[in-house]
């Protein structure tokens, strides 16, 4: 049910990491803050979340008199009609919520209750101020590019998917190496054996691609990153291409079967001899921004980078 604030109907979808008591308590705080502001709240729940939802909707929780809460289940319509998706958790929970936000073409706001939480806009200790900004609509929305992934066998499309962070092409058996040929914009670049190949967005450059040795790319820069993983070749270095490039990875016939993991959540089968084509996604993910802090400051804070000795430029 949508609540009405100053003549305007507003509703927000809450997606929280299941099973953690601290997140359950935080979710109750969110519900009560939105109740006071006259904003309706949807809570995402699936079967694995049932015990958490029961705790959140007990009398002292979300079902307090006058509190407008609707329980919804995962699906393409879960977020339709909402103003935004609010995430309580880490990056895994954020990626789960991003699927729903993209389908509904609404922005997503992450509150980090995980470990690093690079995708989150703010930390748990700033929850009240973040929610106050949402209530006052004092936020801006930016778009983050995504990836569209297609798998072909003999020019026939057998599967497709999308990713916000990265598409990870990996050896299915984990035995031996995956033999691939890398192609950019219709031209072969290198053939090599490897554990896998990552194709990442700038948003994903601080995730799996970073762990595999790829560069950190500022989110304002639109580009595609290609990062081979444990490649057995002289030239198998990370590449940064145009955002309009077509990246293709062909698995050599007679090599191992592979798998393509989209954000580590959605899995596509990759038979030996198949071809993976990855391009800039047609539908971006919308991102709630609460402040204009430089990306460098966020990176230093999240990764706890040493900056002792920095003097800076004098004005």
Swiss-Prot record:
GO molecular function: ATP binding; metal ion binding; NAD binding; NAD+ kinase activity
Disulfide-linked positions: none
Active site: 91
Ranges in a coiled coil: none
Location(s) in or outside the cell: Cytoplasm
UniProt EC number: 2.7.1.23
Protein's UniProt keywords contain Nucleotide-binding: yes
GO cellular component: cytoplasm
This protein's name: NAD kinase
Keywords linked to the UniProt accession: ATP-binding, Cytoplasm, Kinase, NAD, NADP, Nucleotide-binding, Transferase
Top-rank lineage group of the source organism: Bacteria
Family to which this protein belongs: Belongs to the NAD kinase family.
Organism of origin: Rhodococcus erythropolis (strain PR4 / NBRC 100887)
Binding-site residues, NAD(+): 91-92, 96, 165-166, 195, 206-211
């Amino acid at each position: 049910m949508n609540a009405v604030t100053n003549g305007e109907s507003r509703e927000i979808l809450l997606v929280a990491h299941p099973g953690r008591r601290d997140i359950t308590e935080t979710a109750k705080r969110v519900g009560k803050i939105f109740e006071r502001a006259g904003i309706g709240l949807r809570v995402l729940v699936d079967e694995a979340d049932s015990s958490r939802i029961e705790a959140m909707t007990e009398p002292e929780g979300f079902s307090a008199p006058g509190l407008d809460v609707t329980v919804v289940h995962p699906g393409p319509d879960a977020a339709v009609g909402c103003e935004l998706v609010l995430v309580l958790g880490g990056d895994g929970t954020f990626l789960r919520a991003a699927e729903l936000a993209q389908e509904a073409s609404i922005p997503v706001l992450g509150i980090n209750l995980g470990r690093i939480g690079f995708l989150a806009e703010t930390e748990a200790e700033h929850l009240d101020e973040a929610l106050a900004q949402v209530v006052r609509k004092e936020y801006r929305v930016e778009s983050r590019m995504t990836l569209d992934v297609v798998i072909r066998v003999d020019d026939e499309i057998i599967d497709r998917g999308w990713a916000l962070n990265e598409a990870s092409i990996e050896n299915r058996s984990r035995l031996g190496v995956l033999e691939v040929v890398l192609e950019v914009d219709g031209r072969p670049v290198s053939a090599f054996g490897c554990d896998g190949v990552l194709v990442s967005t700038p948003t994903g450059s601080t995730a799996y691609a970073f762990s595999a040795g790829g560069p950190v790319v500022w989110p304002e820069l639109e580009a595609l990153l290609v990062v081979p993983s444990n490649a057995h070749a002289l030239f198998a270095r990370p590449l940064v291409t145009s955002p309009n490039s077509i990246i293709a990875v062909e698995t050599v016939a007679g090599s191992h079967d592979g798998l393509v993991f989209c954000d580590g959540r959605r899995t596509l089968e990759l038979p030996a001899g198949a071809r993976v084509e990855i391009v800039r996604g047609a539908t971006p993910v919308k991102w709630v921004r609460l402040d204009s802090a430089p990306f460098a400051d966020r990176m230093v804070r999240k990764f706890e980078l040493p900056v002792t000795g920095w003097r800076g430029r004098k004005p």
